[in-house]
Amino acid sequence: MKVMKFGGTSVGTPERMKSVAAMVSESGEQVFIVLSAMSGTTNSLVEISNYLYKKNSDGANDVINNLERKYMGHVEELYSTDEYKQRTKEFLASEFNYLRSFTKDLFTSFEEKNIVAQGEIMSTNMVANYLEEQGVKVCLLSALDFMRTDKNAEPDSQYIKEKLGAILKENEGYQIYITQGFICRNAYGEVDNLLRGGSDFTASLIGAALPAEEIQIWTDIDGMHNNDPRVVGNTEAIRQLNFEEAAELAYFGAKILHPTCVQPAKFAGIPVRLKNTLDPKAEGTIIDNVLLKGKIKAVAAKDNITAIKIKSSRMLFATGFLRKVFEIFECYQTPIDMITTSEVGVSMSIDNTTHLNEIVDELKKYGTVTVDSDMCIVCVVGDLDWSNLGFETLVLDAMKNIPVRMISYGGSNYNISFLIRESDKARALQNLSDVLFYKK
């Protein structure tokens, strides 16, 4: 069995839903489909929640009514028979009435999670009904029945495997199974989610639990590219990536794949394939455990980075200095992207500036602090083990005319990263492409 995940844009219109349905049914294979909410729906549900936090029931009801009209229009386009139009409209009406029920009560984060969950519940029901109307044997499963996190908000993989296995045993003989993308229950049985973007994670967790033959992530892009096509004109799709390479690219800016997605698949040894709904026959990108020795695969960039430098003579020959610095970032739950040290200073980069002022105030206890905003991280990804001679020369040659604030290498064998000004990003990405991939 293959797991196929389709994001919000892939099911964003009735026509897109029909295309996805045709794709999964015409293959003749037994597949497990993971669907996100229709594009724009989650934003609307979050908007409803924001109104309810402010006790603005009228504002919430306006958004609910507009969203309901939109969905009822989709029903008319999607189905060809009155029976399935009526069935789906009745289901959607009950969903929107459920959303309206929240406008009358106390509103907390618990209610917000219930509201946000409804987008995927609606999209999966619509696609399942359409497939059934087309005569396909389809089984709609609620992710709330088998997706669960533990007390640390981490996926409970053993529970997922056992519960999903039992559910599938009770529902044998279907060609297609469908479930929701990021909703789950927490350790206390409450409706929760794997955070936005977690539908990739869900697909990977389900694939590992089955175990699947392959996990496919479908978007409207032809796999991962060797550079950012929005910035660099001459990019190419990457045909193969190692799991570690894919994780680096996902973290450093490749929006096509969520960074957490590859971990369950990697540990289960299940390949992940990135495919394009607009060009289903395209090869896409395969992610597996194969590592091509000495091969540089791609360049990526992460924007909105802030650099922080602490300079202190007290750091010289001192022990425990870095621990104190790290404890400040931990206290404010702010992850560090890059770090470099010298005898009397340490430089770090962060992408979450929510508590920047508090962090800087705390750091000033230990030395002089300087902050640089509007920075970005450019990283080169591939098999960059230190024993592979020559890649450093190529990379540094490409960056020779770009002012570099920090360089990080050695924490991973799969990337070398540069912190530069955002204004220099386009030039850096183009230079790296020219030197690394086109030998200019």
Predicted segments — roles?
Residues 1-257, 262, 421:
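Nucleotide/pyrophosphate-binding catalytic subdomain
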Residues 1-2, 30-33, 72, 114, ...:
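Structural motif
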